[in-house]
Structure formats: C-alpha cells, structure tokens
Amino acid sequence: MRAARLFVVSVLAALSLAAQEPSLSGTWSQTKADDIAAAINATVKDMNFIKRPIARGRLTKLNPAYKKVMITVSDKEVVVKLDERTPIHMPPGGKTAPWTREDGEKFMVAAQVAKDQLVQTFKNEDGERTNVFKLSPDGRTLTLTATVKSPQLPRPLTYSITFGR
C-alpha cells in the first residue's frame, strides 16, 4: 500500500512539472540573427549624404547581435541582461523607471510581462526602442524583435534575434 501511494505521488509530481508553463526567466544563447547591418542600411538609405553615415554609425554601435540574454521575472522586478552589459532593473506592470545606459544617455524604461512575452520599452527625447521577447509555445526558443524609432530616422529600424536555452 505504501509503495502504491509513493508511486501515485511520484506520478502526480511528474505531471505537475510537465504541466508548468514555460518561463521567460533564464539564460538564453543566440541561435540565429537577422542581418542587422542590412536592416540599418535599409533604414538610413533615404537620408541625405551628410546624415546617413552618422545615423548608420550610431545605429550600428547601439544595435549589436546579442549573443546571450538573461531574464529574471518576479513580482518585484524584471531584470534583463544582454551579453556583458549592466543588467537593467525595471518595475513590473509597465511602470516606468529612470535608467542610464553605460554611455551616460538617460532613458525612461518599462517592462510589461504577459504569459509568453516581455515588452521592454526605452524612451528619451531622441526616440524610443521597443524590445519584444517572445517565447515559443514549447518554451525552447526566445525571439527578440527590436524596433527603434526616432524623428531623425525616415523609417523604424526593426530586426530579430533568436535564442535557445
């Protein structure tokens, strides 16, 4: 009888683990990335010859093909760390918080978490960037779609990077 109870408890525990929703939280490594240089060139192609190389250089510097992302989601905060950059701590629920990038540029940053998606938004007077981290249904793949908008750009810059566990 005791063995039967242990078996039932073991089966229920296994089913409970199998039924858990996949989580955004964890460490993810790049498996595929769009051609970001081509996306940048398409974004700046209609700019005049003076502004185009300046915009291309700045966009190239600020939009690398990240190799690793670490995400931590809790009731108290959302933390995103890209490659070796400083982690970004944000309040949950879409509330904005001040954040200063490593180069000193200041932003208001926000994080909105849904079951299978994290939307991270950076805004300042120069424009805004939105990172949408979308989890695949099986929880094995995370796709980052970045969109950069600015009044200085003729069109938004958009590209995607795919990560695996």
What are the functions of these language-model segments?
Residues 10-19:
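Hydrophobic h-region of N-terminal signal peptides that target proteins for export
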Residues 20-165:
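PEST-like low-complexity, intrinsically disordered acidic/proline/serine-rich tracts
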Residues 1, 19-20:
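Absolute protein N-terminus
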Residues 1-10:
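Bacterial N-terminal signal peptides that target proteins for export
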